[in-house]
Design a protein with these regions (language model features):
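Terminal "cap-and-tail" regions of soluble proteins that handle hydrophobic small molecules
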Residues: 1-19, 113-204
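Short beta-edge strand/loop motif at the mouth of beta-sheet-based domains
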Residues: 18-21, 25-26, 32-36, 44-82
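A generic structural signal for alpha-helix starts
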Residues: 32-35, 42-45, 126-130, 134
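Hydrophobic pocket/interface hotspot
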Residues: 37-38, 47, 74, 108, ...
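Short, low-complexity Ser/Thr-rich regulatory SLiMs
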Residues: 76, 98-102
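Amphipathic hydrophobic-ligand
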Residues: 90-91
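Short, structured patches in soluble enzyme cores that scaffold and shape functional sites
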Residues: 100, 110-114
Length: 204
């Protein structure tokens, strides 16, 4: 069993908006070196253990594809400091930055910038934020040592993960509300869509 609130609270979340562009930022510390995290984030074999089955050529000019999900192009790649890719479309950019910290730990920063999300204000962060929360959780579980039979695809639909997703949606709801970029009506509509996707059957 995972401590859901511990993992939710381990992440710092921010959201901002400039015109039609929404930026989502996340930060979390990991008890692993930047080199260890880099391998976990870019080696398809390791990605399949904690995130999702992935194929591709992880170098500048290469591309990647998540099984039955998003893909993109590698725009920047500087191991073990970070990378920048398109994610799911030409107007969606994902950047990961790894910063060495004390005692062989690493501070990970994730930024996802999207232009033209079909939701007013920064409410679109509720469409992608919970998914990245799940990814950062998976990485934390991987660093701590996953059991041999762990499958991230089936784990994504487990009751435990759905409870985690519910708390993630609520966390992002607060972050977007505090940003002041979205009306309450539009925000609640985005939250309902997000909850239906990430935690079906749960009411706000």
């Amino acid at each position: 069993m995972i401590d859901i609130l511990e993992h939710i609270n381990a992440v710092q979340r921010e959201v901002s908006r400039t015109g039609e562009t929404v930026s989502l930022q996340m930060r979390r510390a990991y008890r692993a070196t930047p080199e260890e995290l880099w391998d976990a984030l870019t080696d398809p074999t390791r990605l399949a253990r904690w995130f999702w089955p992935t194929t591709g050529n992880f170098q500048v000019g290469g591309s990647f594809q998540l099984q039955d999900m998003a893909g993109g192009d590698i725009l920047e790649c500087e191991p073990p400091k970070g990378f920048k890719v398109t994610y799911g479309g030409p107007n969606s950019f994902l950047e990961i930055r790894l910063h060495p910290a004390a005692n062989d730990s690493t501070d990970l920063e994730l930024e996802h910038v999207v232009t033209g999300i079909p939701m007013p204000g920064a409410g679109g962060a509720l469409y992608v934020g919970p998914g990245w929360d799940g990814g950062l959780l998976g990485l934390a579980l991987y660093v701590a040592g996953l059991p041999d039979d762990h499958n991230p695809v089936t784990f994504a639909d487990s009751p435990e993960m759905l409870k985690f997703n519910e708390q993630s949606v609520r966390a992002w709801l607060k972050v977007v509300r505090d940003s002041g970029t979205t009306s309450e009506e539009d925000l609640l509509e985005a939250a309902k869509v997000s909850m239906a996707q990430f935690a079906p059957g749960v009411e706000l």
